[in-house]
């Protein structure tokens, strides 16, 4: 499967920049004791959170609002799949609608900033995902059903573009974690 190059993928993403392109400094002191693969995932997550703090530029607030709406829509669909409503789930968890909206807004902000930071990192370092990166992403999305997912994605241009963005960010995140200074 071919991925789009960064220029094509970036056409639909704001061009945020970073205040610094130096390697991030991270601590693994709080990392759970786990297998090497889980530790590497933790390292990538911590590195992306650290990098997200460097995002600068004028980011349209609508991007954050759209991401929060997506999170809320997904939560509503999950609630319905469980035979309940989001409102009922919030009541069960003693979370007010106002608290939930603030939580999802913060989650969306973190998610958007991490994505934009990884985009900027990829642009700066000229990172392009490998075929292996594409397959790892597909495997993580549908373990054991990779072929079916590839066929499904090839029929939907929007999903294919979303996959291209995700794979490019995954490759950037791998590079970021590999260059991180662990303290």
PLM region descriptions:
Residues 1-183:
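FKBP-type peptidyl-prolyl cis-trans isomerases
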């Amino acid at each position: 499967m071919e991925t789009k190059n960064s220029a094509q993928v970036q056409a639909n993403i704001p061009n945020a920049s970073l205040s610094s392109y130096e390697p991030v400094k991270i601590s693994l002191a709080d990392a759970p004791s786990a297998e090497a693969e889980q530790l590497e995932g933790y390292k990538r997550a911590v590195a992306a959170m650290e990098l997200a703090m460097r995002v600068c530029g004028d980011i349209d607030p609508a991007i954050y609002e759209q991401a929060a709406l997506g999170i809320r829509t997904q939560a509503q669909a999950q609630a319905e799949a469980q035979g309940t409503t989001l409102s009922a789930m919030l009541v069960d968890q003693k979370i007010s609608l106002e608290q939930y909206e603030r939580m999802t807004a913060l989650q969306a902000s973190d998610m958007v900033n991490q994505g934009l930071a990884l985009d900027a990192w990829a642009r700066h370092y000229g990172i392009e995902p490998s075929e292996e990166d594409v397959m790892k992403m597909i495997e993580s999305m549908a373990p054991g059903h990779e072929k079916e997912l590839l066929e499904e994605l090839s029929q939907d241009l929007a999903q294919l573009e979303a996959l291209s963005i995700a794979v490019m960010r995954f490759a950037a995140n791998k590079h970021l974690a590999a260059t991180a200074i662990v303290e």
